């Protein structure tokens, strides 16, 4: 895998990825507690980019219209639940928001990696690592494995959605088999957490 030219070749940057509701956050939290390394969270940068008054915020409101603003927010924040619903249901809108945010998220992650240049190891949590082509900012990729039924149930509970809606969202992402071809490490997050904990302890 070729490394992005703006990044330090000697730094170890672990890209943690996996399907939606596969358990990435739980694993990232454990890694942070176990070896206390900086965590760069793509989802958090995505949220930051669409904060009120930002350039992306203005573009999102102009594109989707005033209804995308949360009417219950005192700061006129984007209604993220509505935005998610729209982009999950409409491929054109999904492509638009991805084209807007993904390059900026990648740019932010590169900037943060360089800020932590003296750290030997960083953890980059990137849900759409393969789909958004973020592989070149990682020196290795750790993929979370989770049974489809478990993943679906977690997503239904977390997002308060139907089984049909959960399945549609899962189907939008690359399947595990395709992702696993490009992963360096598989973390099995089925029923026994000790499986992936043992794997992590061996690797860090």
UniProtKB/Swiss-Prot annotation:
Domain DPCK: 13-204
Compartments, record wording: Cytoplasm
Family to which the UniProt record says this protein belongs: Belongs to the CoaE family.
PROSITE patterns documented for this protein: DPCK
EC main group: transferase
Binding site for ATP: 21-26
Pathway recorded for this protein: Cofactor biosynthesis; coenzyme A biosynthesis; CoA from (R)-pantothenate: step 5/5
Protein's UniProt name: Dephospho-CoA kinase
Reported function: Catalyzes the phosphorylation of the 3'-hydroxyl group of dephosphocoenzyme A to form coenzyme A.
Organism superkingdom: Bacteria
